[in-house]
C-alpha cells in the first residue's frame, strides 16, 4: 500500500539549506518516505520556503524530489481555524492562524502522514495525525 507524506518546511530546509545537525536524518527519512509513496508539498510550505531561494531554484528542488504539489483543501482551512482557536484559548499569543495549523490540517484532511521536526505542536492540535519525526523515527 502506498502512503503519501506531506513534508514540513523545516525538513526541506534541512536538505536544501546549509548542512546542519538534522540534515542527515531529514535526507534519509525523505528517501524512506519516497519509497513508501508520494511526497507532498503544499502552498503553505512553498510560501515559507520562498524567502530562501529563487522560484526557479525551488521548482527545480521540488522536481528533483518528485514532489506532488497540492493546494490547501477548504476543509483543512476550517480545521486550521479550529486548531488556532484552541491554541488561543490555551494562552497562545499569535492572533493570526499559524502556518503549522494549515500544514497539519491539510495532512489530516487529505490523509497524508506528516514529516516534521516539530512534532509537539502538531500532536497537541492534531492527535490523530500520523507524524514522522526524530522522536518517532530516530
Regions found by a protein language model. Name each.
Residues 42, 46, 55, 59, ...:
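A general structural signal for well-ordered alpha-helical segments in protein cores
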Residues 122-127:
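Short loop/helix-cap segments at secondary-structure boundaries that form the rim of catalytic
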Residues 53-77:
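Active-site-proximal, substrate-binding regions of enzyme catalytic domains
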Residues 3, 68-113, 117:
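Active-site neighborhoods of divalent-metal-dependent phosphate/nucleic-acid chemistry enzymes
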Residues 11, 45, 76, 102-103, ...:
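Alpha-helix capping/helix-boundary segments
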Residues 70-73, 131-135:
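Short acidic-hydrophobic, aromatic-tinged amphipathic segments that line or gate anion-handling sites
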Amino acid at each position: 500500500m502506498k502512503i503519501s507524506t506531506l513534508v514540513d518546511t523545516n525538513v526541506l530546509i534541512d536538505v536544501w539549506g546549509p548542512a546542519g545537525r538534522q540534515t542527515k536524518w531529514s535526507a534519509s527519512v525523505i528517501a524512506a518516505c519516497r519509497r513508501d509513496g508520494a511526497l507532498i508539498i503544499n502552498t503553505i510550505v512553498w510560501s515559507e520556503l520562498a524567502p530562501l531561494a529563487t522560484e526557479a531554484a525551488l521548482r527545480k528542488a521540488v522536481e528533483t524530489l518528485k514532489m506532488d504539489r497540492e493546494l490547501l483543501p477548504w476543509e483543512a482551512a476550517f480545521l486550521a481555524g479550529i486548531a488556532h482557536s484552541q491554541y488561543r484559548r490555551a494562552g497562545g499569543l499569535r492572533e493570526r492562524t499559524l502556518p503549522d495549523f494549515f500544514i497539519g490540517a491539510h495532512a489530516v484532511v487529505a490523509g497524508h502522514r506528516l514529516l516534521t521536526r516539530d512534532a509537539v505542536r502538531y500532536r497537541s492540535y492534531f492527535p490523530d495525525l500520523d507524524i514522522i519525526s526524530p522522536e518517532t523515527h530516530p
